[in-house]
Amino acid sequence: MTYDFDKIIDRTGTESVKYDLRKDVFGKADVIPMWVADMDFPTADFIRDAIIEKAKTDVYGYTFREDGYFESIVQWIKRHHQWETKKEWMAFTPGIVNAINLAVMGLTNEGDKIIVQPPVYHPFFYAINNHNRTLVQNPLIDTDEGYIMNYDLLEEQAKTAKMLIISNPHNPVGRSWRKEELIRLGEICVNNNVLVFSDEIHCDLVLPAFKHTPFASISEEFAQNSITAHAASKTFNLAGMATSTVIIPNNNLYKKYVDFIHSTEADLGNIFGKIATKAAMENGDEWHSQLIDYLNDNIRFAIDFIHKEMPKIRVHNPEATYMIWLNFKDYEISDDELNRKMVFEAGLGLNSGHIFGKEGECCMRMNLACPRSVVMKALKQMKNVF
């Protein structure tokens, strides 16, 4: 079956954060929204059909996640990432941001140092600061070939840290970390008893010619010193289902984490989240394959257009995610002026780079998970200003 990713869907009036909050966020309601990391493609038919079938039941009472739910995730990860997991390592969380917050609250103490690698997904900062932990920033290094990790600084920071939260693949810069990069990071963390929380929500959005390496798959030592977060929400556009999974091979760590989840009553979930996830994991291979090809074409088109028509914008070829990270520093304008021009002159709603850390000043994150015609229109509007 061939899936249609060119179809335009009007999401206005659906309580969509991405569309219906444009006026609140940007001060202008008619910008093309390319900010929030969800996709504008139709929900896959096999997911929609599974939800509709469940909706036909007469009672929407409390449910649990049966073995088949977790087994579908085990098999997906095995097929796509060659990592042999076990359902006994898995636990439900109501979204990965929740999973990170639960890990911070349940596995660290107030004042503990937690390392992140900016520019990075901004809820990492909130999870640390909001719970009175100490934020330690290990900024990535921007090179001509792309962003790399600062291991020398990490060696020093790890000596007094309790946890490191890694974005693997990295949001927003689009790196799919190589095995050797993760090995070096993992060895530093193991040697200093720093627990690794690996947010792998974008693992199924790695582009052709690149490969995702699950952090915990590298060695038993890394598996025993890590929590991996996985979800179908980015890949199959199910963010509204608030459903994700943590994978914890260490029995003692698993028990401590799951006991804390129980103590917060955050483990009930919802009926349709588990139905949608299981349908995606069991039936989504072909849809996923076509999605990756379409996203890759969108990204290639955008990168080529920018290099040709707006060469002052610096942009690396992403290896994963459906976002591109745009650097406007050569325009020598302020962050505020960049945002004003993008919204009120170009008519585009992108994520301001500064939310990902000070390293993102005068940068922007652009979401390309939309029909090609929208990408083309947006880039032409950007060209008229930049």
Whereabouts are the PLM-identified features?
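PLP-dependent aminotransferase-like
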Residues: 105-166
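Helix C-cap/helix->beta junction micro-motif
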Residues: 131, 191-192, 222, 346
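Active-site phosphate-binding strand-loop segment of PLP-dependent enzymes
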Residues: 141-210
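Active-site PLP attachment segment
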Residues: 218-256
